[in-house]
């Protein structure tokens, strides 16, 4: 592959993985299997490793999770809620053990093993023993404030046995018996049932009415101590024992293992015992027990090096494939999906499974009428593993992908170096609808309340056909749609109006220009500052910008060399949509009259004059970056009253420390 082709593929993989992360971690509505996600991630990691010049800070390969919903207030975690690396077999566990021992130079190590609860990760904050705030994991950096819903969980103490200030992490879950009862009630009421206990727990905690969560009989296991003031903890097992003494519910099935053989035995034991539990688990978490060794091993941007999650193999069942359905995405990619005779897999009824592309169908020789093996990778997303050839009768029908789009009947093409078939008709209704869904999404124009269901209704009612049509919607039109009342219609009109003020990069990303992801959109917006400047740019000018390759430059020029696009931009202007970049330019950071420009800052302790969130906003507005933990890259620690371990770490590493008074003096310069 040429460098341009490599860069193009990397951008496509990043966009794809960001979408998958958003669907899985934020919407609780995954669209692909773990296996497909892992294949794409491994391809991205391989390409980035071989082409380090294309590695970016916001690549899914170094980032945790995806974006946060706007239903609840946003909460920035004091320290990131990192995800864990995965192990799928004994060899992966032994590799983990080898890496750990190499990282600590042969020092004796012991592990602590815990059941991996399949629920919703949450963070709980206590001040002087009182529960003051609880939040979801979100994207690992920012979560949602769900304090009132968490207070309904009886396993969460509202007051601890000691007046300590701390932050703990845990997993909120729904017991199996509660899940069965809830779905029976929903079926009786004619309501849609939850797919699994994890979705039920997540859905319950995202209800705006705490009374609903209170009826759901949720529970929670605390699995870690993120921060504590005035106490030194030397091991993870000590932390769990201490948390149990404070009144938290910790899982009793944890075990200290002196060797990796003992770890493997523990994994095998609980793989057998798993069905006997009254809650879902999807694996085993293995951690280095000693905190000092954890610190020596450190973390990557995505996960700690001292812990790993062993994922149980997925349950496999056999069912009949009755048909293949096609869907068209916003870029014209046509994706086949298997239609199955309903079968129960990992606790839920499965009727459909992704087949990904024509090559996979051909490689696995999948035919209509075949009996196929189906599993839920990660116990979540259905996929066809293989065909049961012994069950073939000769009546099965070979499947051939169509030559024309199933939506608009235009001819399909396979572009060079792609496995997917594409519809290249820009007027294809399916592409327009999917493009509209992308335009309003979180990383684009971020219009709250305008999701896939509403877009589909608006599209089918012929109220919208272009992005600009959204800004001409009226409350009266919305009131004609299903499930819209006066308040919801007014709220959506206000949300659409508010999106006009977005910075240029969101609009550029929302337009869906081929090869232009969220990062490239920001780079373009920052460089050109206005839409008009970008529209006038030539290919050579674009290629001169760092991170903009030849393929992307060609795509941008081609996109804006279209009368329909220019008309769309004029419509945006007529509706008052912002066309300028509102962020701080990197080139201007050095001119900001502030110490903070380009610096990494950590806030700790209580600030009297302003809260930490306000201080964070001020620092970031002045070009600084605020993180939740002290590291070698930290330039400054601002310490308020009752500053804890972060202050001690700063002193240990000779990092500059300010009190609040010094901080305020700098702000007032």
Swiss-Prot record:
Transmembrane segments: none
Residue sites binding NAD(+) per the record: 34-38, 83-84, 114, 137, 171, 287, 311
The protein's enzyme class: ligase
Top-rank lineage group of the source organism: Bacteria
Keywords in alphabetical order: DNA damage, DNA repair, DNA replication, Ligase, Magnesium, Manganese, Metal-binding, NAD, Zinc
GO molecular function, one term: DNA binding
Binding of Zn(2+), residues: 405, 408, 423, 428
UniProt keyword annotation of Glycoprotein present: no
Active site, renumbered: 116 (n6-amp-lysine intermediate)
GO annotation terms (biological process): DNA repair; DNA replication
Reaction(s) catalysed by this chain's protein: NAD(+) + (deoxyribonucleotide)n-3'-hydroxyl + 5'-phospho-(deoxyribonucleotide)m = (deoxyribonucleotide)n+m + AMP + beta-nicotinamide D-nucleotide
GO CC aspect terms: cytosol
Record SMART domains: BRCT (SM00292), HhH1 (SM00278), LIGANc (SM00532)
Record-linked Pfam families: BRCT, DNA_ligase_aden, DNA_ligase_OB, DNA_ligase_ZBD, HHH_2, HHH_5, Nlig-Ia
PROSITE patterns: BRCT, DNA_LIGASE_N1, DNA_LIGASE_N2
HAMAP family for this protein: DNA_ligase_A (MF_01588)
The protein's name in its UniProt record: DNA ligase
Lineage: Bacteria, Bacillati, Bacillota, Bacilli, Bacillales
């Amino acid at each position: 592959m040429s460098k341009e082709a490599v860069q193009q593929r990397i951008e496509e993989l990043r966009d794809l993985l960001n979408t998958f992360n958003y669907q899985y971690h934020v919407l609780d509505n995954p669209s692909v299997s773990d296996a497909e996600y892992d294949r794409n991630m491994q391809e991205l990691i391989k390409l980035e490793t071989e082409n380090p010049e294309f590695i970016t800070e916001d690549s899914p390969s170094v980032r945790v999770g995806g974006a946060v919903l706007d239903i609840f207030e946003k909460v920035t975690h004091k320290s990131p809620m990192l995800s864990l690396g995965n192990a799928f077999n004994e060899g992966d566990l032994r590799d983990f053990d080898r890496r750990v021992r190499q990282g600590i130079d042969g020092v004796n190590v012991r592990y602590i093993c815990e059941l991996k609860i399949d629920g919703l990760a949450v963070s709980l904050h206590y001040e002087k023993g009182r529960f003051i705030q609880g939040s979801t994991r979100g994207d690992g950096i920012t979560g949602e404030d769900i304090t009132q819903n968490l207070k309904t969980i009886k396993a969460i103490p509202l007051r601890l046995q000691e007046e300590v200030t701390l932050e703990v992490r845990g997993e909120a879950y729904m017991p199996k018996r509660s899940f069965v009862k809830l779905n029976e009630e929903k079926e009786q009421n004619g309501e849609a049932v939850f797919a699994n206990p994890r979705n039920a727990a997540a859905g319950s905690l995202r209800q705006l009415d705490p009374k609903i969560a209170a009826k759901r009989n949720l529970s929670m296991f605390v699995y870690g101590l993120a921060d504590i003031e005035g106490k030194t903890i030397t091991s993870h097992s000590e932390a769990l024992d201490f948390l149990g003494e404070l009144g938290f519910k910790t899982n009793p099935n944890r075990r200290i293992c002196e060797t990796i053989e003992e770890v493997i035995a523990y994994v095998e034991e609980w793989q057998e015992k798993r069905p006997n539990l009254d809650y879902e688990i999807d694996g085993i978490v293995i951690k280095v027990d000693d905190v000092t060794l954890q610190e020596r091993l450190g973390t990557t941007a995505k996960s700690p090096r001292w812990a790993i999650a062993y994922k149980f193999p997925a349950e496999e069942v056999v069912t009949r494939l009755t048909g293949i359905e096609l869907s068209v995405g916003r870029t014209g990619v046509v994706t086949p999906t298997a239609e199955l005779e309903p079968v129960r897999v990992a606790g839920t009824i499965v009727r459909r499974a992704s087949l990904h592309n024509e090559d996979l169908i051909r490689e696995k020789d999948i035919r209509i009428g075949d009996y196929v093996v189906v599993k839920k990778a990660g116990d979540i997303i259905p996929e066809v593993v293989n065909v049961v050839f012994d069950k073939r009768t000769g009546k099965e029908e070979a499947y051939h992908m169509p030559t024309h789009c199933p939506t608009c009947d235009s001819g399909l093409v396979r572009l060079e170096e792609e496995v997917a078939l594409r519809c290249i008709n820009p007027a294809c209704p399916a592409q327009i609808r999917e493009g509209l869904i992308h335009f309003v999404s979180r990383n684009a124009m971020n219009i709250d309340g305008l999701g896939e269901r509403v877009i589909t209704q608006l599209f089918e009612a012929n109220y919208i056909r272009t992005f600009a049509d959204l800004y001409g919607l009226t409350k009266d039109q919305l009131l004609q749609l299903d499930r819209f009342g006066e308040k919801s219609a007014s709220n959506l009109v206000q949300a659409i109006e508010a999106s006009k003020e977005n910075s240029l990069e969101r609009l550029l990303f929302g337009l869906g220009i081929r090869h232009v992801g969220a990062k490239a959109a920001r780079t373009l917006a920052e460089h050109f500052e206005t839409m008009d400047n970008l529209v006038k740019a030539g290919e050579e000018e674009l290629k001169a910008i760092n991170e903009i390759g030849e393929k992307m430059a060609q795509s941008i020029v081609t996109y804006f060399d279209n009368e329909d696009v220019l008309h769309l931009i004029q419509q945006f202007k007529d509706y008052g949509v912002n066309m300028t970049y509102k962020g701080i330019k990197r080139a201007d950071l050095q001119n900001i009259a502030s110490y903070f420009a380009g610096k990494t800052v950590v806030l700790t302790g209580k600030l009297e004059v302003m809260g930490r969130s306000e201080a964070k906003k001020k620092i970031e507005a002045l070009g600084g970056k605020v993180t939740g933990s002290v590291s070698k890259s930290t330039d400054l620690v601002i310490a308020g009253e009752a500053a804890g371990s972060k202050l001690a770490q700063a002193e240990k590493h000779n990092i500059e420390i300010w009190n609040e008074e010094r901080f305020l003096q700098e702000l007032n310069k």
